[in-house]
Amino acid sequence: MGRREEMIAKIKELMLQPERIRNIGIAAHIDHGKTTLSDNLLAGAGMISEELAGKQLVLDFDEQEQARGITINAANVSMVHNYEGKDYLINLIDTPGHVDFGGDVTRAMRAIDGVIIVVDAVEGVMPQTETVVRQALREYVKPVLFINKVDRLIRELKLTPQQMMERFSKIIMDVNRLIQRYAPEEYKKKWMVKVEDGSVAFGSAYYNWALSVPFMKRTGVKFNEIIDLTLKGDNRTLRQKAPLHVVVLDMVVRHLPSPIEAQKYRIPHLWEGDISSDIGQAMLNCDPKGKMVMVVTKIIIDKHAGEVATGRVWSGTVKSGQEVYLINTKRKARIQQVGIYMGPERINMEAVPAGNIVAVTGLRDAMAGETVAEEQIEPFEALHYVSEPVVTVAIEAKNVKDLPRLIEALRQLAKEDPTLHVKIDEETGQHLLSGMGELHLEVKLYKLKKDWGIDIEVSEPIVVYRESITKSSPMVEGKSPNRHNRFYIVVEPMPDEIYNAIKEGIIPEGRVKNPKEVAKKLAELGMDYEIARGIVDIYNGNMFIDNTKGVQYLNEVMDLLIDGFHQAMDEGPLAREPVMKVIVRLLDAQVHEDNVHRGPAQIYPAIRTAIHCAMMKSNPVLYEPYQKVIINIPYEYMGAVSREITQRRGQLVDMKQEGEVMTIIAEAPVAEMFGFAGSIRSATSGRALWSTEHAGFKRVPNELAQQIIRQIRQRKGLDPNPPTEKDVCPLF
């Protein structure tokens, strides 16, 4: 029996013992060494050869990832680790650190119970680290910390052990501050990481060594020995004395929870159903004999097998031939192949029980975030993505006969990655693809050309703006075309505290199921409780509140009113861009008793026009997306980089100096950041390391707003002149 077969046999045996399973992720800022750490853990567990580990980047198996040297897709792999004489099955998911791929991180967090946060010892905690920690804690995922690239502190910065300890303490404090800020109330203290108990390890993923206090106590290895070996460059002895995989995986087994432990506190927060029901209990107890429930976290398109859905099994056992329901899509499906991933290789299994990460084929209509179950149940709460699409390109097939394939290719891309939005521009017939940034779209379009072999023409990237208001409107009346239905509304700007709570998922988006609970949260954030009690719907950072009293037949048209509210929010009055931070309050209404006279053709225009008219009376404004830019450069390029940023309407937020290296943190509008990669490369002779992340939306300066509105309207084939109140408000 070969090494691989032995491994598979062991994995099969451990899959049945959930107390011996750890579902974990590795998450970090770009280039902090996450994929190198993953590979060396795999090498240690005997999954790839040690010589290749760290150079091979086994989890970066997409050829684009290898070429760019960044991880784009969240890959997963199962491996076995022995701790205190017992074998454990570790399912590892490697997630991207680049902000344009933040959606993958969000999806991976749903499948795992614990996460290794990797922080570069030289750079410390960076903005993307904060984003990833926030996502993990929001999904009730417990963290441990690995401080990487310690070899650079010894070799390049030549720090003394004392200085290194000070640096580690600062990183640990920063990570704990994030845990304090974002962890669920009952875990703020419990989940803090500490050197003493071994929930912190430090080392070098590239040179394959690590240390933790329990390891040093157990083996007698001293930090000073490690420093000497590093200075001598004796990497082989380093690897043997303090093997990375032993230290890190020991920390994982000891401090991160098994599915049996984790599901007890995660299920009540992630699942919206009744916990006391049979299925609720089966998930709570990770019961392989219960009814099967899994959540899809990723769809991969495989050349041979078609669509492969990977996800987490919460209860029951996934078997080939099983009939299942896709809860969100409301479709039935039959599971075909069942397996697990070992890197790019999918290994077939007869069945995969609760507590494991599974890969299945046959779920053709599933998307990431789908709940799959043996019977119809409540779905898991929607996945929250930290960024939103801010850049759009228009795509056309060069050859008309490729059009059907282009449509199918875009459908599949959007399915693999729900942070991509695809829609057809009805005016021009072009397909519009929106993503989280220039790199995100570049990678996806390359994939489209390569995998599908379609010749496409791509427009210059276009920025997605937002419309909003700055003051409350007077009451506006909206009438249906037949004049039988009237709605009286006001619009108000949403306070930042409430908007941020929605964006952070503290107040969930969607139809409000429990108005009292949401009203209480809104009141805590400063909204009048009596007004907040009428909350009906939250949509893309906007709110619809029903403050009417006893209006007859209103309930019958409420769904239509919500649809009309969504239409008004999807396309604002200024330039038909999405709306943000607007509260729409319905104060009174008259609804016709006969439903023939109150259908969609009557209700939609009435509510839509009323909202747009009210917005025009509330000093409407345009917002644009901003990016945070983090640049590391040698000191002498400081001036050139500052100029590059200020020319792009950017502002310097912070600067730090570390030896010869400067870290500049700036914010700039996305619209001005196109082509930044080329400019910064030539300004610094290619010596800048930089990354970006979404920094929210800011108001466009008035002098630019009119010009931008004109450009957007012209592009959409509308009258270029910005509309006036008269144009939008009908004369009743």
Swiss-Prot record:
A single Gene Ontology CC term: cytosol
Gene3D superfamilies according to UniProt: 3.30.230.10, 3.30.70.240, Elongation Factor G (Translational Gtpase), domain 3 (3.30.70.870), P-loop containing nucleotide triphosphate hydrolases (3.40.50.300), Translation factors (2.40.30.10)
Pfam (any one): GTP_EFTU_D2
CDD domains, per the entry: aeEF2_snRNP_like_IV, EF2, EF2_II, EF2_snRNP_III, Elongation_Factor_C
Record SUPFAM superfamilies: EF-G C-terminal domain-like (SSF54980), P-loop containing nucleoside triphosphate hydrolases (SSF52540), Ribosomal protein S5 domain 2-like (SSF54211), Translation proteins (SSF50447)
Binding positions (GTP): 28-35, 94-98, 148-151
GO MF entry, a single one: translation elongation factor activity
Superkingdom of origin: Archaea
Stretches assigned to coiled coil: none
Diphthamide: modified positions: H597
NCBIfam families, alphabetized: aEF-2, small_GTP
Family the entry assigns: Belongs to the TRAFAC class translation factor GTPase superfamily. Classic translation factor GTPase family. EF-G/EF-2 subfamily.
Function: Catalyzes the GTP-dependent ribosomal translocation step during translation elongation. During this step, the ribosome changes from the pre-translocational (PRE) to the post-translocational (POST) state as the newly formed A-site-bound peptidyl-tRNA and P-site-bound deacylated tRNA move to the P and E sites, respectively. Catalyzes the coordinated movement of the two tRNA molecules, the mRNA and conformational changes in the ribosome.
Protein name, as recorded: Elongation factor 2
Organism: Pyrococcus horikoshii (strain ATCC 700860 / DSM 12428 / JCM 9974 / NBRC 100139 / OT-3)
Chain's gene name: fusA
